[in-house]
């Protein structure tokens, strides 16, 4: 079992900081490349650029919770939720939001 984790590509767990604007405010987010790849995939399936997807997600969390605590951790957890969904969910949710920020 440990081989599965130990032999993963080093690139997947290397960190990268990306700068973006959310509601006109410049910010930077540091995540491991595996998470950035997953977020790019989600954004693509939603038909959005990564920046637009992250802005939408941020706004949804803000609307639901009134504030956003630790957005980077929320993004990691969102990726875990996305990756844990069975393939059938993707077919069932086609045409509807695939990832609701408040989940």
Model-derived segments and spans:
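Amphipathic, hydrophobic secondary-structure cores in small proteins
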Residues: 21-74, 79
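Short, positively charged interaction helices/loops
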Residues: 64-103
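Short Lys/Arg-rich basic patches
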Residues: 4-30
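Non-catalytic regulatory/interaction regions at protein termini and inter-domain linkers
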Residues: 11, 15, 54, 58-60, ...
């Amino acid at each position: 079992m440990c081989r599965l984790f130990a032999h993963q590509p080093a690139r997947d767990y290397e960190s990268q900081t990306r700068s973006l604007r959310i509601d006109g405010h410049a910010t930077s987010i540091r995540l491991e490349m595996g998470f950035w790849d997953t977020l790019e995939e989600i954004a693509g399936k939603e038909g959005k650029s990564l920046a637009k997807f992250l802005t939408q997600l941020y706004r949804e969390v803000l609307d639901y919770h009134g504030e956003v605590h630790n957005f980077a951790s929320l993004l990691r957890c969102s990726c875990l939720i996305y990756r844990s969904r069975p393939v059938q969910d993707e077919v069932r949710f086609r045409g509807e939001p695939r990832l609701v920020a408040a989940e």
